[in-house]
């Protein structure tokens, strides 16, 4: 019964569905509207606002199988993954939830009945923990459920503070909290370990399988516990743990999902030892990596993307350890989809993107993996002690892309630890250097704190009255301004848009009779809008009324560029894949810049298709609509939110026909046709996994096209062709140039041969050895190597030294026939000469080259060759 993990998942959800619960799909691994979380790490994450009373749902009972990741940040299991029976970067949490509906009695009954009746687990194998003072739960467990008192364990405050207990759950320092009951399974006395609360509780015999949290208090800032008006329930059961029990195994890595992935990895890498811990690491990591990419995370050097990169690189390193000679990690995705069943729906839709992203990251790391491992191996072999210094760990990170935990993973296998504090010091020093190198003059407004509130009226008007509520000069609040003063003016109401969401701030004028304040920029300061600029005439004081006039032309051009970023975002997702997410943008009156996640460069044909699709949507002349609604409504409409952003309860949703719908607080055109034309001017990578498109619109796009046409016409004139035949004419010209270059090379070879015949006759005898030392004129540096080969052949046995002096540059070459290399090394001789002309060089015993920066010293340097050789050939 329920022998597969997929069957167990279905049984759990069906059980709670029949008991009146709404089955809710797993939310994304990237928490939406909760920047406090790096990744979704519990089933209750998506219901957090419901528990806090900030979100209302149409149901009061829910159940889910939530995909979770614990790697990076506070919840980081990465170091232990693969080495223990139950640590994972990715896991599924089965859960049932009550939002002010049922409480302890039903929650306990639901859990017990599912385990003992549906799954038919032996009751004698189960024991339960409760919070020490939770007598209500004790009575339910003993009197109603029938758990023997000896199988019920009270756990008190065991973490050094009141309510700090394994059996008391709290969301934070304040807010909803309450006692919990945990159900444990006894794997048998053949496994070491003791019951919860005993000194042996850390053993593997008694394993927690279900945690039932009773949220019944609201913790105040002073520590007081106030009863919640509507107590709720949050439960969680790790599917991997219960699957291990149902499948009669002890380690999670022995269940069907992991065994399929382990066997597939072993097949790909031709490994026979299925107990190898590296196989466990890889089987775990493919789950987190594949599902993170499916949910829009791409490998990068910051935030979630860097955690993903660390996991991928750890898996690749373990593959290398097993003998992988080629990319292998991405090949596990089809097996993962197969074993995950219904839980892999999102993965199926993004399979191609996931595989390409994994392969690209693996190939990128492969370029430095071997060399980095060699450096690390050398450092460990030379190590005196059992701690690797942080500087070496940082070098591996900075030069070879080794995350510090990957270095620690390698060291661990040799019982060596990494000085992570030293690593952090080296990292901090690098950041300081980067900041110092990149410092520009800082505007005092960067740190300006303003408490005032400004009403923004600029969605519907560009001219409006406003009253001055505050004035700031050089970061300090002042009451008045005189002509010539530079300041920030805050109004109670303004049509000026303050820079945010990538859209630059408006420019324009604040004026009254005899008064004019030139606004050069507009910024947001909390809930206030600050107009930055200078008073060009008159005087101003707090309380004065002004007319605010936005520069209409600049605002309109900015709106063209902002609106087209929405079309561009939608086009990229449609043509490249739904993994594409916005990573940043800059929109002003001149151009737009759009950064997005993508694992490879955008091909020219893809870029053209994106541009064409955007222009098609412009020509369709969609009407733009902007509506304010609550977040749930926006989600239901399919509005795209920027992951990691914190949105208010009410959000503004901008829709462009049936093509684009996004959350956005910026200003836009009335219809897409207003944009006129969209032209991409460049595309490139700005970081691993992040691409950037720069583009222009409207009149700027027309000017860009006209400029390209003018350049094409100039090229046509130079080629004596019309515009239509420029490409064919240019190709013919390049073919001819290639042919001429080949002929020129052949002529140079003939000239070198002729020159060598003449030069060979100039050789002199030094202690019975033929020696030719010559400064050459009219010979290219590229011909030196061939010329010295020719001369050595002509001499039969001898030494050749040639030099060329150019503009502030010297080129040298020394050739020694093999019969003489025991007496004279070409590298030593060329180094001696180079040191006299401001250079250095080296090479093989029979041929070496060098460069220098002092051509004026070449003659004297060459004069020293014969004495140098005379001494060595004596």
UniProtKB/Swiss-Prot annotation:
One of its GO terms (molecular function) is tRNA binding. The gene is alaS. Its cofactor is Zn(2+). Coiled coil: none annotated. This is Alanine--tRNA ligase. Catalyzes the attachment of alanine to tRNA(Ala) in a two-step reaction: alanine is first activated by ATP to form Ala-AMP and then transferred to the acceptor end of tRNA(Ala). Also edits incorrectly charged Ser-tRNA(Ala) and Gly-tRNA(Ala) via its editing domain. Binds 1 zinc ion per subunit. The keyword Thylakoid does not apply. Its EC number is 6.1.1.7. Belongs to the class-II aminoacyl-tRNA synthetase family. It is an enzyme of class 6 (ligase). Zn(2+) binds at residues 562, 566, 664, 668. SMART domains: tRNA_SAD (SM00863). It catalyses: tRNA(Ala) + L-alanine + ATP = L-alanyl-tRNA(Ala) + AMP + diphosphate. It comes from Shewanella sediminis (strain HAW-EB3).
């Amino acid at each position: 019964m329920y022998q597969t993990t997929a069957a167990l998942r279905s049984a759990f959800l069906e059980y709670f569905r029949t008991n009146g619960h709404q089955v809710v799909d797993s939310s994304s691994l990237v928490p939406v509207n909760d920047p406090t979380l790096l990744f979704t790490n519990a089933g209750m994450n998506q219901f957090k606002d419901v528990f806090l009373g900030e979100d209302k749902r149409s149901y009061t009972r829910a159940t889910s199988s939530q995909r979770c990741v614990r790697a990076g940040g506070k919840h980081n299991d990465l170091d232990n993954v693969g080495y223990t029976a139950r640590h994972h970067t990715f896991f599924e949490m089965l859960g049932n939830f009550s939002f002010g509906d049922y409480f302890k009695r039903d929650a306990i009954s639901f859990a017990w009945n599912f385990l003992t009746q549906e799954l038919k687990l032996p009751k004698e194998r189960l024991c339960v923990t409760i919070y020490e003072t939770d007598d209500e739960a004790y009575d339910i467990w003993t009197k109603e459920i029938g758990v023997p008192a000896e199988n019920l364990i009270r756990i008190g405050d065991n973490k050094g503070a009141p309510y700090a207990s394994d059996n008391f759950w709290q969301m934070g320092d304040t807010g909803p909290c309450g006692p919990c009951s945990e159900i444990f399974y006894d794997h048998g006395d053949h496994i070491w370990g003791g019951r919860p609360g005993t000194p042996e509780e850390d053993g593997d015999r008694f394993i927690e399988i279900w945690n039932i949290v009773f949220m019944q208090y609201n913790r105040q800032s002073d520590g007081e516990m106030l009863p919640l008006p509507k107590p709720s329930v949050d439960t969680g059961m790790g599917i991997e743990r219960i699957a291990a029990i149902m499948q009669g195994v002890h380690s999670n890595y022995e269940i069907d999902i992991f065994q399929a992935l382990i066997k597939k990895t072993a097949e790909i890498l031709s490994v026979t030892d299925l107990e190898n811990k590296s196989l466990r690491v890889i089987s775990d990591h493919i789950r987190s990596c594949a599902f993170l990419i499916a949910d829009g995370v791409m490998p990068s050097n910051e935030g979630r993307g860097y955690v993903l990169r660390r996991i991928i690189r750890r898996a690749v390193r373990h593959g290398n350890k097993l003998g992988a000679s080629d990319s292998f990690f991405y090949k596990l995705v089809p097996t993962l989809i197969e074993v995950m069943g219904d839980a892999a729906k999102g993965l199926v839709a993004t399979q191609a993107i996931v595989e390409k992203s994994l392969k690209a990251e693996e190939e990128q790391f492969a370029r430095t993996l071997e060399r980095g491992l060699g450096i690390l191996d050398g450092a460990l072999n030379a190590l005196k002690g059992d701690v690797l210094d942080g500087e070496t760990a940082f070098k591996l990170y900075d030069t070879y892309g080794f995350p510090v935990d990957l270095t620690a993973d390698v060291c661990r296998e040799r019982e060596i630890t990494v000085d992570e504090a030293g690593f952090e010091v080296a990292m901090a020093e690098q950041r300081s250097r980067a900041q110092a190198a990149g410092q520009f003059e800082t505007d005092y407004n960067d740190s300006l704190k303003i408490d005032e509130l400004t009403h923004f009226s600029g969605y519907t008007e560009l001219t409006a009255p406003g009253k001055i509520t505050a004035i700031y000069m050089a970061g300090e609040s002042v009451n008045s301004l005189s002509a010539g003063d530079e300041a920030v003016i805050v109004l109670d109401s303004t049509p000026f848009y303050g820079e945010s969401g990538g859209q630059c701030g408006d420019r324009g004028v604040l004026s009254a009779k005899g008064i004019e304040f030139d606004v050069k920029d507009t910024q947001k300061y909390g809930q206030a809008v600050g107009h930055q600029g200078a008073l060009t005439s008159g005087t101003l004081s707090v309380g004065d009324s002004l007319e605010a006039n936005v520069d209409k032309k600049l605002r309109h051009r900015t709106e063209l560029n902002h609106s087209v970023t929405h079309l561009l975002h939608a086009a990229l997702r449609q043509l490249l894949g739904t993994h594409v997410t916005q990573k940043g943008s800059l929109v002003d009156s001149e151009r737009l810049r759009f950064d997005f996640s993508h694992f490879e460069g955008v091909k020219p044909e893809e870029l053209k298709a994106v541009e064409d699709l955007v222009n098609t949507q412009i020509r369709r002349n969609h009407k733009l609509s902007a509506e304010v609604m609550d977040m749930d409504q926006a989600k239901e409409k399919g509005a795209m939110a920027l992951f990691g952003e914190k949105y208010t309860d009410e959000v503004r949703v901008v829709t462009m026909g049936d093509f684009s719908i996004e959350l956005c607080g910026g200003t836009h055109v009335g219809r897409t046709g207003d944009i006129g034309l969209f032209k991409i001017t460049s595309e490139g990578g700005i970081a691993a996994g992040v691409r950037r498109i720069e583009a222009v619109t409207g009149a700027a796009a027309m000017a860009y096209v006209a400029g390209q046409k003018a350049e094409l016409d100039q090229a046509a004139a130079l080629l004596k062709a019309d515009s239509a035949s420029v490409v064919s004419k240019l190709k013919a010209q390049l073919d001819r140039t290639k042919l001429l270059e080949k002929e020129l090379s052949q002529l140079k070879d003939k000239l070198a041969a002729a020159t060598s015949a003449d030069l060979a006759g100039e050789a002199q005898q030094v202690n019975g050895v033929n020696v030719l030392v010559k400064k050459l004129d009219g010979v290219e540096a590229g011909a030196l190597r061939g010329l010295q080969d020719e001369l050595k052949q002509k001499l039969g046995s001898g030494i050749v030294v040639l030099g060329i002096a150019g503009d502030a540059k010297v080129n040298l070459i020394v050739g020694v026939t093999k019969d003489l290399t025991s007496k004279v090394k070409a590298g030593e001789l060329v180094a001696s000469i180079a040191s006299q002309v401001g250079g250095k060089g080296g090479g093989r015993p029979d041929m070496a080259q060098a460069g220098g920066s002092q051509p004026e010293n070449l003659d004297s340097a060459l004069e020293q060759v014969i004495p140098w050789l005379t001494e060595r050939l004596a």
